[in-house]
């Protein structure tokens, strides 16, 4: 009789354990399912991608970013963003891409655009300083600190204007262009086309800048005169050591 009672208690305890285990398993599976659903339906954010597919579901708007003063100048600069929102699988995707730059001259109380049309996207805008290593734009902009700001003499740009690989997107996988402008943004000029990869740049010496890039699977270097905005020489690197 006692053995039957003991067996009965053990069976009840096992039933409770099995029930608790089942509930925990259900809760775990439910949490996993909720996580998967949230991940599948959330809005994904990407940068420097423009969707050019003929899709009525793509919602686009432009937005001007924050104005920041250019070091060594009273002129301010701000990016123009193209923001696209479109369906992606079970959720949505939002892309933010820089299409242009606007400048403001507080002395003349006027604003102007770097390019006459806002198309394609800018992958980078690099501020160049005289007789020193180039610095990222956000590091040379005027700031409230005791250090003397380094004047910017020009900007170097890497941009993409066309969908060259026909994937219905404009991004860094397409062929690029390399361009320059003066520090005030009033003399924008594209100097190099059909760039597969931007490989870097040198310090400015005697108002000249060397730009390294890949084109036709070959690494090349272009020497640019910043005053005339012309390429004074262009050569290839040897493909063999």
Put a short name on every predicted segment.
Residues 163-172:
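Acidic, glycine-anchored loop motifs typical of Ca2+
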Residues 100-104, 174-183, 225:
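Beta-propeller blade signature
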Residues 121-156, 194-212, 231, 238-241:
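Conserved beta-propeller blade repeats
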Residues 44-65:
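Short extracytoplasmic/periplasmic juxtamembrane "stem" segments immediately C-terminal to an N-terminal membrane anchor
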Residues 64-125:
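Extracytoplasmic/periplasmic/luminal assembly and interaction segments
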Residues 115-118, 191-195:
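Surface loop/turn motifs at the tips and blade-to-blade linkers of beta-strand repeat domains
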Residues 112-113, 187-191, 233:
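A short beta-strand motif characteristic of beta-propeller blades
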Residues 13-35:
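Hydrophobic membrane-insertion alpha-helices, especially the h-region
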């Amino acid at each position: 009789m006692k053995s039957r009672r003991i067996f009965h208690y053990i069976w009840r305890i096992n039933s409770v354990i099995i029930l608790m285990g089942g509930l925990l398993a259900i809760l775990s599976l439910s949490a996993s399912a909720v996580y998967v659903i949230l991940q599948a339906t959330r809005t994904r954010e990407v940068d420097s991608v423009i969707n050019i597919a003929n899709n009525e579901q793509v919602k686009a708007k432009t937005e001007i970013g924050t104005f920041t003063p250019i070091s060594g100048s009273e002129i301010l600069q701000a990016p123009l963003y193209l923001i696209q929102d479109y369906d992606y699988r079970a959720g949505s995707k939002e892309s933010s891409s820089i299409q242009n730059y606007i400048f403001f001259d507080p002395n003349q109380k006027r604003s102007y655009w770097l390019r006459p049309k806002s198309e394609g996207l800018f992958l980078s805008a690099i501020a160049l300083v005289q007789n020193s290593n180039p610095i990222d734009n956000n590091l040379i902009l005027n700031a409230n600190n005791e250090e003397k700001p380094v004047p910017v003499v020009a900007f170097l740009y890497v941009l993409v204007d066309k969908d060259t690989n026909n994937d219905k997107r404009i991004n860094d996988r397409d062929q690029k262009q390399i361009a320059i402008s003066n520090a005030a943004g009033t003399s924008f000029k594209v100097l190099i086309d059909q760039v597969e990869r931007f490989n870097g740049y040198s310090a400015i010496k005697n108002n000249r800048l060397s730009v390294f890039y890949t084109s036709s699977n070959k690494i090349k270097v272009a020497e640019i005169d910043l005053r005339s905005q012309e390429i004074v020489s262009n050569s290839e690197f040897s493909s063999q050591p």
